[in-house]
Amino acid sequence: MAEPSVESSSPGGSATSDDHEFDPSADMLVHDFDDERTLEEEEMMEGERNFNSEIEDLNRESDMPIQELLSLYGYDGTIPLQEDDDDEDEEEEEEEGEDDDDVDNDDNSGCSGENKEETIKDSSGQEDDTQSSNDDPAPSVASQDPQELIRPRRCKYFDTNSEIEEESEEDEDYIPSEDWKKEIMVGSMFQAEIPAGICRYKENEKVYENDDQLLWNPDVLPEDKVIEFLNEASRRTGDEKGLDAIPEGSHIKDNEQALYELVKCNFDTEESLRRLRFNVKAAREELSVWTEEECRNFEQGLKVYGKDFHVIQANKVRTRSVGECVAFYYMWKKSERYDFFAQQTRFGKKKYNLHPGVTDYMDRLLDESESAASSRAPSPPPTASNSSTSQSEREDSTTSSSNQNGLSANGPGDIPSKDEAKPEGLHINGPTGGKKTPHTDLDTNGYETESLSLDPKVAHSTSRSENDFEEKNERPLKRRRINSNGKESPGSSEFFQEANSHGKLEELETLDD
């Protein structure tokens, strides 16, 4: 029988092609099942393990000598130590080195051949050892020296790291230190060395000639006396005007002018108070009253230039300083003149559009936008009710004029309401007689039904007018709709088309009659 080829014997498909997926055979899937009972049995076995016996064994082994402990775990002490082997190797190398110095090149070549043979033997011996260790792992462990097992070996991890660090230090770029590691550069070692000749002033020379002027020293008088002095300085006499007449609160303000007077009087409170009462303007910067012309010019400049007080002072209010203009502005904003000014300039400038007393600015903004939109929107055209009202007013005027002249347009019938559409029938003009027909015997146009029924044309026209009148009553009148922007809605055009069509029909009826 021919043996099966390698390709057919491979369970995962052909060995030559790598495109096929791995397909396990039936023999491989026979034992491929997961039995949960084995896991449960292993858990039971682990649960039955006695930990007390393990602790006792460990305690017993701790007191045991090292030789007995090694023999207990299968290690023999008859194996020569590795250090002795190392010493022997070193001695052989030294002897070989001495022989190399005395022997010629030929001998060296021979020695090299012998060394090659020895290395081959050693390599073959190592291969035999590795094979035996693979076959029987326990003797390989036993072949190691017990002192080598016990002695902690030096880890080369730190050595490799040190080598890597040495290499990286040579190639690394400069990296600035982190913020928390930075040192505060304070001290003589961090000071700059200024060369001589740059500074214009000498060490004991003053920078400027003028002497300093002391304005206030808080260390001379205690705080209680200073507060009492400020209370006396701010007391009212009743003759104040302008800003000084405004009542102040109970809190104490730092009056710098009063404190400076106290320093000039060598901290004599009575003398400083006397000077303050004698020269009130020096202690209190009184704002002089503005004239009506100055106020009007200031408001006009505020309209034109805004809150640019330098330009306002230069062009409009030259009699006042810029500081006085600023102080007057804040007083003026709290007065009634500002309210009137805001109302007058509401549509001119948006910045004065809001009243100072208004807090809900959004409602005010919406109201103003709606009022502005309604003022810009065109007036709406007359609606259906307005057109009918105007038509009824015109007919009332014509009937009154015809009655005054002795003529009647629509007869002696009652005037229809403004919501009703008036179909126009026959118009018979002539003098009205004194005899009047009762209202119940008259038709919608004010004529007798008996006389009209005799004429076929009149009867036909009246029947058509009654049908049109019923249709108009059944169909509600469409009113014209206008959007908020003042544009006509699309539904309004339909109403005018319908009204025009009705008007044309009525004109045709009158022509036929």
From Swiss-Prot:
UniProt-listed CDD domains: SANT_MTA3_like
Subcellular location as annotated: Nucleus
Keyword vocabulary terms for this entry: Nucleus, Repressor, Transcription, Transcription regulation
One term of GO molecular function: transcription corepressor activity
Compositional bias (Basic and acidic residues): 17-36, 46-63, 416-425, 463-476
Main location: nucleus
Ranges of Low complexity composition bias in the record: 1-16
A GO CC term assigned to this protein in UniProt: nucleoplasm
Annotated region described as Interaction with HDAC1, given as residue ranges: 157-261
Protein known as: Mesoderm induction early response protein 1
Organism of provenance: Gallus gallus (Chicken)
